[in-house]
Protein backbone atom coordinates (compact mmCIF):
# COMPACT_ATOMS: atom_id res chain seq x y z
CA UNK A 1 0.00 0.00 0.00
CA UNK A 2 1.40 3.35 -1.05
CA UNK A 3 1.84 6.06 1.56
CA UNK A 4 -0.34 9.08 0.62
CA UNK A 5 1.46 12.24 -0.37
CA UNK A 6 1.54 14.91 2.33
CA UNK A 7 0.17 18.36 1.61
CA UNK A 8 0.57 21.48 3.75
CA UNK A 9 -2.20 24.08 3.63
CA UNK A 10 -1.49 27.50 5.14
CA UNK A 11 -4.64 29.16 6.42
CA UNK A 12 -7.99 27.84 7.68
CA UNK A 13 -10.09 30.55 6.10
CA UNK A 14 -12.63 30.04 3.28
CA UNK A 15 -9.97 29.08 0.71
CA UNK A 16 -7.89 26.96 3.07
CA UNK A 17 -10.74 24.76 4.24
CA UNK A 18 -12.03 24.31 0.68
CA UNK A 19 -8.53 23.29 -0.41
CA UNK A 20 -8.21 20.88 2.52
CA UNK A 21 -11.58 19.27 1.82
CA UNK A 22 -10.81 18.67 -1.85
CA UNK A 23 -7.30 17.40 -1.12
CA UNK A 24 -8.70 14.94 1.40
CA UNK A 25 -11.20 13.81 -1.23
CA UNK A 26 -8.16 12.77 -3.28
CA UNK A 27 -6.98 10.66 -0.32
CA UNK A 28 -3.98 12.87 0.39
CA UNK A 29 -2.55 13.44 3.87
CA UNK A 30 -3.38 17.05 4.74
CA UNK A 31 -2.16 19.34 7.51
CA UNK A 32 -3.59 22.86 7.83
CA UNK A 33 -1.74 25.53 9.81
CA UNK A 34 -3.55 28.62 11.06
CA UNK A 35 -2.39 31.25 13.55
CA UNK A 36 -5.95 31.85 14.75
CA UNK A 37 -8.03 29.88 17.23
CA UNK A 38 -10.94 29.00 14.96
CA UNK A 39 -11.90 28.33 11.35
CA UNK A 40 -12.93 31.36 9.32
CA UNK A 41 -9.88 33.52 8.70
CA UNK A 42 -10.66 37.22 8.66
CA UNK A 43 -14.39 36.48 8.99
CA UNK A 44 -13.75 35.72 12.67
CA UNK A 45 -14.09 39.14 14.30
CA UNK A 46 -11.39 40.14 16.76
CA UNK A 47 -10.31 43.38 18.42
CA UNK A 48 -6.70 42.24 18.41
CA UNK A 49 -4.61 44.58 16.21
CA UNK A 50 -2.54 41.67 14.92
CA UNK A 51 -5.60 39.93 13.48
CA UNK A 52 -6.88 41.32 10.19
CA UNK A 53 -10.53 40.67 10.90
CA UNK A 54 -13.68 42.10 9.42
CA UNK A 55 -15.27 45.19 10.98
CA UNK A 56 -17.87 44.82 13.73
CA UNK A 57 -20.68 45.60 11.26
CA UNK A 58 -19.42 43.76 8.17
CA UNK A 59 -21.80 41.94 5.85
CA UNK A 60 -20.57 40.13 2.76
CA UNK A 61 -20.87 42.20 -0.43
CA UNK A 62 -21.57 39.27 -2.75
CA UNK A 63 -24.84 37.39 -2.39
CA UNK A 64 -25.03 34.09 -0.56
CA UNK A 65 -26.11 32.48 -3.85
CA UNK A 66 -22.73 33.20 -5.42
CA UNK A 67 -20.67 32.99 -2.21
CA UNK A 68 -21.62 29.55 -0.92
CA UNK A 69 -19.78 26.32 -1.63
CA UNK A 70 -21.37 24.16 -4.33
CA UNK A 71 -21.28 21.11 -2.09
CA UNK A 72 -22.47 22.85 1.08
CA UNK A 73 -25.18 25.53 0.60
CA UNK A 74 -25.69 28.26 3.16
CA UNK A 75 -28.70 27.83 5.46
CA UNK A 76 -32.00 28.80 3.83
CA UNK A 77 -32.76 31.21 6.68
CA UNK A 78 -29.64 33.29 5.97
CA UNK A 79 -30.35 36.68 4.38
CA UNK A 80 -29.15 37.47 0.86
CA UNK A 81 -26.09 39.22 2.32
CA UNK A 82 -25.09 37.40 5.53
CA UNK A 83 -23.31 39.06 8.45
CA UNK A 84 -19.77 38.21 9.47
CA UNK A 85 -21.12 36.20 12.41
CA UNK A 86 -23.20 34.10 10.02
CA UNK A 87 -20.30 33.66 7.61
CA UNK A 88 -17.96 32.51 10.38
CA UNK A 89 -20.59 30.03 11.62
CA UNK A 90 -21.06 28.77 8.06
CA UNK A 91 -17.36 28.14 7.50
CA UNK A 92 -17.12 26.36 10.85
CA UNK A 93 -20.13 24.20 9.95
CA UNK A 94 -18.42 23.34 6.66
CA UNK A 95 -15.29 22.26 8.52
CA UNK A 96 -17.30 20.11 10.92
CA UNK A 97 -19.42 18.58 8.16
CA UNK A 98 -16.36 17.43 6.22
CA UNK A 99 -14.41 16.50 9.38
CA UNK A 100 -11.61 18.99 8.76
CA UNK A 101 -10.87 19.95 12.37
CA UNK A 102 -8.62 16.92 13.08
CA UNK A 103 -6.38 18.11 10.24
CA UNK A 104 -6.01 21.72 11.48
CA UNK A 105 -3.32 22.96 13.84
CA UNK A 106 -4.52 26.26 15.33
CA UNK A 107 -2.44 28.99 16.97
CA UNK A 108 0.44 27.95 14.75
CA UNK A 109 2.52 30.43 12.76
CA UNK A 110 4.30 29.38 9.58
CA UNK A 111 7.76 30.91 9.89
CA UNK A 112 9.40 29.71 6.68
CA UNK A 113 8.71 27.61 3.58
CA UNK A 114 11.64 26.16 1.65
CA UNK A 115 11.79 23.78 -1.31
CA UNK A 116 14.73 21.42 -0.80
CA UNK A 117 16.91 19.56 -3.30
CA UNK A 118 14.51 16.59 -3.24
CA UNK A 119 11.53 18.78 -4.21
CA UNK A 120 10.10 18.46 -0.72
CA UNK A 121 8.65 21.44 1.11
CA UNK A 122 10.40 22.14 4.40
CA UNK A 123 7.83 23.97 6.54
CA UNK A 124 9.01 25.64 9.74
CA UNK A 125 6.27 26.49 12.24
CA UNK A 126 6.08 28.10 15.65
CA UNK A 127 3.55 27.30 18.38
CA UNK A 128 3.79 28.45 21.98
CA UNK A 129 7.45 29.29 21.41
CA UNK A 130 8.28 25.83 20.06
CA UNK A 131 9.84 25.66 16.58
CA UNK A 132 9.00 22.60 14.48
CA UNK A 133 10.13 21.53 11.01
CA UNK A 134 7.97 19.23 8.87
CA UNK A 135 8.40 18.02 5.29
CA UNK A 136 5.60 17.88 2.72
CA UNK A 137 5.22 16.85 -0.91
CA UNK A 138 3.13 19.89 -1.82
CA UNK A 139 2.18 23.29 -0.43
CA UNK A 140 -1.05 25.29 -0.77
CA UNK A 141 -0.79 28.91 0.38
CA UNK A 142 -4.26 30.10 1.43
CA UNK A 143 -3.45 32.84 3.94
CA UNK A 144 -5.16 35.60 1.96
CA UNK A 145 -3.87 39.09 1.22
CA UNK A 146 -5.40 41.17 4.02
CA UNK A 147 -2.97 40.33 6.82
CA UNK A 148 -0.31 42.94 6.02
CA UNK A 149 -1.42 46.58 5.59
CA UNK A 150 0.21 48.76 2.95
CA UNK A 151 0.56 52.48 3.58
CA UNK A 152 0.83 55.07 0.79
CA UNK A 153 3.41 57.82 1.02
CA UNK A 154 2.27 61.43 0.87
CA UNK A 155 4.43 64.56 0.96
CA UNK A 156 3.97 67.04 3.76
CA UNK A 157 2.77 66.69 7.33
CA UNK A 158 -0.65 65.62 8.61
CA UNK A 159 -1.41 66.65 12.18
CA UNK A 160 -4.39 64.35 12.66
CA UNK A 161 -4.59 60.62 13.31
CA UNK A 162 -3.57 58.44 10.36
CA UNK A 163 -5.02 54.92 10.31
CA UNK A 164 -5.14 51.96 7.96
CA UNK A 165 -8.44 50.10 7.56
CA UNK A 166 -6.58 47.07 8.94
CA UNK A 167 -6.54 48.81 12.33
CA UNK A 168 -10.24 49.71 12.32
CA UNK A 169 -12.43 47.27 14.24
CA UNK A 170 -15.23 49.39 15.67
CA UNK A 171 -16.47 52.78 14.49
CA UNK A 172 -17.03 54.61 17.75
CA UNK A 173 -13.47 55.91 17.39
CA UNK A 174 -14.76 58.31 14.72
CA UNK A 175 -17.47 59.88 16.90
CA UNK A 176 -17.74 63.65 16.25
CA UNK A 177 -14.55 63.64 14.17
CA UNK A 178 -14.02 64.80 10.60
CA UNK A 179 -12.93 61.78 8.57
CA UNK A 180 -11.24 61.48 5.18
CA UNK A 181 -11.26 57.99 3.66
CA UNK A 182 -8.74 57.43 0.86
CA UNK A 183 -9.60 54.70 -1.62
CA UNK A 184 -12.57 53.16 -3.36
CA UNK A 185 -12.18 49.48 -2.50
CA UNK A 186 -14.43 47.36 -0.32
CA UNK A 187 -12.80 48.34 2.97
CA UNK A 188 -12.72 52.04 2.11
CA UNK A 189 -16.40 52.10 1.23
CA UNK A 190 -17.30 50.18 4.39
CA UNK A 191 -15.33 52.64 6.54
CA UNK A 192 -16.93 55.61 4.77
CA UNK A 193 -20.47 54.29 5.24
CA UNK A 194 -20.06 53.22 8.86
CA UNK A 195 -17.99 56.19 10.05
CA UNK A 196 -20.47 58.72 8.65
CA UNK A 197 -23.08 57.43 11.09
CA UNK A 198 -21.09 58.82 14.04
CA UNK A 199 -18.61 61.34 12.59
CA UNK A 200 -19.22 65.05 12.23
CA UNK A 201 -18.39 64.62 8.53
CA UNK A 202 -16.94 61.89 6.32
CA UNK A 203 -15.43 62.49 2.89
CA UNK A 204 -14.05 59.87 0.53
CA UNK A 205 -11.24 60.47 -1.97
CA UNK A 206 -10.90 58.44 -5.18
CA UNK A 207 -8.05 58.75 -7.64
CA UNK A 208 -10.35 57.55 -10.42
CA UNK A 209 -14.04 56.96 -10.99
CA UNK A 210 -15.93 53.95 -9.65
CA UNK A 211 -19.35 52.51 -10.22
CA UNK A 212 -21.19 52.11 -6.93
CA UNK A 213 -23.37 49.08 -7.56
CA UNK A 214 -26.62 48.66 -5.57
CA UNK A 215 -27.06 45.38 -3.71
CA UNK A 216 -30.51 44.81 -5.16
CA UNK A 217 -32.11 45.39 -8.55
CA UNK A 218 -35.77 44.50 -9.05
CA UNK A 219 -35.71 43.01 -5.56
CA UNK A 220 -33.00 40.49 -6.44
CA UNK A 221 -29.30 40.46 -5.46
CA UNK A 222 -27.52 42.31 -8.25
CA UNK A 223 -24.89 39.67 -8.86
CA UNK A 224 -27.56 37.01 -9.47
CA UNK A 225 -29.24 38.90 -12.31
CA UNK A 226 -26.22 40.55 -13.91
CA UNK A 227 -24.34 37.39 -14.76
CA UNK A 228 -25.95 37.00 -18.17
CA UNK A 229 -24.45 40.33 -19.23
CA UNK A 230 -20.97 38.81 -18.96
CA UNK A 231 -21.68 36.85 -22.13
CA UNK A 232 -21.98 40.07 -24.10
CA UNK A 233 -19.00 41.68 -25.87
CA UNK A 234 -17.02 43.84 -23.37
CA UNK A 235 -17.98 47.15 -25.00
CA UNK A 236 -21.69 46.34 -24.92
CA UNK A 237 -21.41 44.89 -21.39
CA UNK A 238 -19.79 48.08 -20.04
CA UNK A 239 -22.35 50.35 -21.72
CA UNK A 240 -25.30 48.25 -20.59
CA UNK A 241 -24.03 47.96 -17.02
CA UNK A 242 -23.27 51.68 -16.86
CA UNK A 243 -26.74 52.56 -18.09
CA UNK A 244 -28.35 50.27 -15.50
CA UNK A 245 -26.36 51.76 -12.63
CA UNK A 246 -27.08 55.33 -13.74
CA UNK A 247 -30.78 54.48 -13.90
CA UNK A 248 -30.93 53.02 -10.42
CA UNK A 249 -28.27 55.04 -8.62
CA UNK A 250 -27.86 58.29 -10.51
CA UNK A 251 -24.57 60.17 -10.48
CA UNK A 252 -22.06 59.76 -7.66
CA UNK A 253 -21.96 63.53 -7.29
CA UNK A 254 -25.61 63.46 -6.24
CA UNK A 255 -24.58 61.83 -2.98
Region locations from a protein language model:
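A short alpha-helix-loop-beta-strand transition element characteristic
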Residues: 45, 56-59, 103, 201-204
Amino acid sequence: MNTPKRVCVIGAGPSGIAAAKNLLDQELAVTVYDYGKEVGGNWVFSDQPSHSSVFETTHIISSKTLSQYDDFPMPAEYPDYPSHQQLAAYFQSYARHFNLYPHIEFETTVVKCELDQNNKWKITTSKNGKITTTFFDALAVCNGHHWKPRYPEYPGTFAGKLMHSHDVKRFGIFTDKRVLVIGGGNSACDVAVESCRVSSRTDISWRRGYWVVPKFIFGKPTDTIGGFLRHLPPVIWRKTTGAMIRTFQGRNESY
